């Protein structure tokens, strides 16, 4: 079911682009990037774990109280975030943004409550994730119909269209919350009325469960902040310094930091799925203090670097055809974002390993240093890119990459000190990976002289994508035959 939902979400994003191509959806980009920051605040799974613990102990009354207090906390916090959203909208001074942002915070509240109720139902062994799956599927399907009607049939103000896009999952969520309460939660309440003898401070327990996971929460907030900061800075520089029109700035930022970033993030998730098992094995090895964890660290790091670098190179070559295939757009806004895949993948891996073996304070400090680095260099790099004749977002991406590099360097230093690993032991292997990928890059670049990548129609773009992926596969098959496995 999860795969079906992911595929439908991807289809929805592509349809959204094509149906709104001639409209201004900048308010959706702005509000959704803020939504990602807010959602990160609630990214801890500790409350669900707390509910499970009480259920295992047969503390059903306490579990029920924690569940209700958690819902109340979500409502209070999202109301507070709604106020913050209003203040942000006033400061940014974009017309009707405050209405969109407030609607977005209501959507956030409903989504979080649905997720919590879903986890609550899972504890009582109802069909796993049934509520969440119904909510996601219905929201996607109804919104596909909704955006078609909004942008092709009923013509209205741009901000109203964005509000209605958020209202669809809000209304569906409210209906599902009411139904789940009537059919399930209310029924379970009769089993949870008997108070346990042990008195528990529910609010403190919930607070503790959130604080225990603060490193991951801060990590997620900082990741989302990279995008939001880029959007705000680009908006002000292009509009005020370089005198772009509002519509041009809106389309420019939406293409880059909404559709482009979504595609890059999907690719990152695919790469992460390739090496996720390896990272988990490494984490287990470090926690158990196995003798071979140093060799395992080098091996897994090599795999991550090799996989991410190869995919980055191939995507740099075929980003144009991918852009034509998905968006049928002559302006290739994916190309400049591709380097993020390599740096973000390594950054994500290094941070995740640090989380299990280093002090929380140290991790938070180096994450903040990377974000501050991005903020400091954002404006100078955007201006430099513009003056050199490149698109302005190249400078914005460069500042993000610089921040990620700082994080990677500090993170590796912390790991080498904590785990007593000498990176020089692995230096030759990393050099070999770089050489192999340089050769791949040269081969693919030479092929571009024969098979052009600047195609203008979808069918030829798909054929070009298949061809270059095939060449990459052939390259690695030949490499495996020529180079013995133990020397790779």
Predicted regions: what they are:
Residues 94-118, 257, 329-350:
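Alpha-helical transmembrane segments of multi-pass membrane proteins
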Residues 159, 181-223, 417-434:
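Interhelical loop/hinge segments that connect adjacent transmembrane helices in multipass membrane
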Residues 79-98, 312-329, 380-386, 450:
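Short membrane-interface helical motifs at transmembrane helix boundaries
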Residues 221-225, 232, 428-485:
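Transmembrane alpha-helical segments of multi-pass transport proteins
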Residues 53-70, 256-342, 346, 357:
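Specific pore-lining/lateral-gate transmembrane helices of multi-pass inner-membrane transport
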Residues 1-17, 21, 172, 184, ...:
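Transmembrane helical elements of multi-pass membrane transporters/channels
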Residues 110-135, 339-367, 390:
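Membrane-interface junctions at transmembrane-helix termini in multi-pass inner-membrane proteins
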Residues 130, 140-179, 183, 361, ...:
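Membrane-interface helix-loop junctions in multi-pass transport and translocation proteins
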